[in-house]
């Protein structure tokens, strides 16, 4: 088993919203690693981060990500999951979609949220810009496809991703067919 697509991006990029719609469109399950981690440890991500600190949180998160990547469906990773090298390595064989939002749009979408532990600071815009600078290269490294989400309706983002998934499926079929052709001697 392997997920049809893995969604990555900063907090507020739409991983959960788009993930639910994409899973519904494909008649698949959404596997959200933040929710898996919360269920496993019996606490919110905010509580886990506060109690364990970020390094220990990331270790626990990497374990959950490895489990999620063994499922069928659509997988939504926590925004910081890609900072862990082992997670990036695991993503190498998967269809990974980077949901890209600008700093301004990300701040707008996450403002007032109590569920985003790294953004509960005095200067959320500055912190968001810092996360963008730290993580953007990782998102680009692991992704096969990037969707710019600023100003796009969720249905349009889902349509873009569905088109990409279909392209990947057709490429794999073509490669498989080519490898099974009888070659003249």
Swiss-Prot record:
Catalysed reactions, as listed in the record: shikimate + ATP = 3-phosphoshikimate + ADP + H(+)
CDD domains named among the record's database cross-references: SK
Family matches, as Pfam families: SKI
Record-level GO cellular component terms: cytosol
InterPro entries: P-loop_NTPase, Shikimate/glucono_kinase, Shikimate_kinase/TSH1, Shikimate_kinase_CS
Top-rank EC class of the record's enzyme: transferase
Compartments in which it is found: Cytoplasm
Entries under PROSITE patterns matching the protein: SHIKIMATE_KINASE
Cofactor note: Binds 1 Mg(2+) ion per subunit.
Binding annotation for Mg(2+): 16
Entry EC no(s): 2.7.1.71
Keyword terms of this UniProt record: Amino-acid biosynthesis, Aromatic amino acid biosynthesis, ATP-binding, Cytoplasm, Kinase, Magnesium, Metal-binding, Nucleotide-binding, Transferase
Pathway annotation from the record: Metabolic intermediate biosynthesis; chorismate biosynthesis; chorismate from D-erythrose 4-phosphate and phosphoenolpyruvate: step 5/7
SUPFAM superfamilies recorded: P-loop containing nucleoside triphosphate hydrolases (SSF52540)
Residues involved in ATP binding: 12-17, 116
GO biological process entries: amino acid biosynthetic process; aromatic amino acid family biosynthetic process; chorismate biosynthetic process
Cofactor(s) listed in the protein's UniProt record: Mg(2+)
MF (Gene Ontology): ATP binding; magnesium ion binding; shikimate kinase activity
Residues the entry annotates as binding substrate: 34, 58, 79, 135
Family, per entry: Belongs to the shikimate kinase family.
Purpose of the protein: Catalyzes the specific phosphorylation of the 3-hydroxyl group of shikimic acid using ATP as a cosubstrate.
Quaternary structure and partners: Monomer.
Name used for this protein in its record: Shikimate kinase
Organism annotation: Corynebacterium jeikeium (strain K411)
Organism lineage string: Bacteria, Bacillati, Actinomycetota, Actinomycetes, Mycobacteriales
């Amino acid at each position: 088993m392997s997920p049809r697509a893995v969604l990555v991006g900063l907090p507020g990029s739409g991983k959960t919203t788009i993930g639910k719609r994409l899973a519904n469109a494909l008649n698949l399950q959404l596997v959200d690693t933040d929710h898996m981690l919360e269920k496993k440890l019996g606490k919110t991500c905010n509580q886990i981060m506060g109690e364990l600190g970020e390094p220990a949180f990331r270790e626990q998160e990497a374990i959950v990500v490895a489990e999620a990547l063994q499922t069928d469906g659509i997988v939504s990773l926590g925004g910081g999951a890609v900072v862990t090298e082992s997670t990036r390595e695991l993503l190498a064989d998967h269809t990974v979609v980077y949901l890209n939002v600008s700093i301004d749009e990300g701040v707008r979408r996450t403002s007032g949220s109590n569920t985003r532990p790294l953004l509960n600071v005095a200067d959320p815009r500055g912190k968001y810009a810092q996360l963008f600078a730290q993580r953007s290269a990782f998102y680009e490294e692991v992704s096969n496809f990037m969707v710019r989400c600023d100003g796009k309706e969720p249905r349009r983002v889902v349509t873009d991703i569905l088109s990409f998934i279909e392209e990947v499926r057709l490429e794999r079929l073509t490669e498989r067919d080519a490898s099974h052709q009888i070659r003249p001697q």
